[in-house]
Amino acid sequence: MEDNQRSRFRKICVFCGSHSGHREVFSDAAIELGNELVKRKIDLVYGGGSVGLMGLISRRVYEGGLHVLGIIPKALMPIEISGETVGDVRVVADMHERKAAMAQEAEAFIALPGGYGTMEELLEMITWSQLGIHKKTVGLLNVDGYYNNLLALFDTGVEEGFIKPGARNIVVSAPTAKELMEKMEEYTPSHMHVASHESWKVEELGDYPGQENKPQ
């Protein structure tokens, strides 16, 4: 994508850890992704907090002059928020409301390395795409092979007949932020939805790129 060409995405939700991991490569990847969002003029939606990978990417995007929205359950604020918080913070009641709000605000999703919470958020967005609840791109930044085993598990699911081959393609993965964003910019869904997009309460989940061109 040329420097003067605007991304198809206006806001992307990034799932990532409230820890930085043991190796610097993970912190570098969070900053690299932040740089890509700034370069493409994409606002950030994330899980709130100013520590770990969450803090690194939120500060980078904010310092780049773009909008940052952190969505965090009230119960997690004392744990995840420490030091200076940048951008806007929206406090919600629980984890379910958090994910719904993130999905409503963003036009696509990216998961950086993280723990159970990051993986759960990623898998829920994949599932929602499979079900037809949203038509938003789901990206996985596979830093230094962190998610190799998870991707292999998806392949096993296809081989054993639990995941349809088309649904395996819901996840767009790449080892670097630049490559991932390039693939996400070009991504077109190829899987069949379990139910129609219109049959869900999609107004609660916001717009997706291209929705404005859909015939009425």
UniProtKB/Swiss-Prot annotation:
Keywords: Cytokinin biosynthesis, Cytoplasm, Hydrolase, Nucleus. It is an enzyme of class 3 (hydrolase). SUPFAM superfamilies: MCP/YpsA-like. Optimum pH is 7.0. This is Cytokinin riboside 5'-monophosphate phosphoribohydrolase LOG8. Expressed in roots and shoots. Detected in the root quiescent center and vasculature, in cotyledons, hypocotyls, stems, leaves, stomata, axillary buds, flowers and fruit abscission zones. Its EC number is 3.2.2.n1. GO terms for molecular function: cytokinin riboside 5'-monophosphate phosphoribohydrolase activity; protein homodimerization activity. Cytokinin-activating enzyme working in the direct activation pathway. Phosphoribohydrolase that converts inactive cytokinin nucleotides to the biologically active free-base forms. It is found in: Cytoplasm; Nucleus. Disruption phenotype: No visible phenotype under normal growth conditions; due to the redundancy with other LOG proteins. It holds the Pfam family Lysine_decarbox. GO terms for cellular component: cytosol; nucleus; plasma membrane. It catalyses: N(6)-(dimethylallyl)adenosine 5'-phosphate + H2O = N(6)-dimethylallyladenine + D-ribose 5-phosphate; 9-ribosyl-trans-zeatin 5'-phosphate + H2O = trans-zeatin + D-ribose 5-phosphate. Belongs to the LOG family.
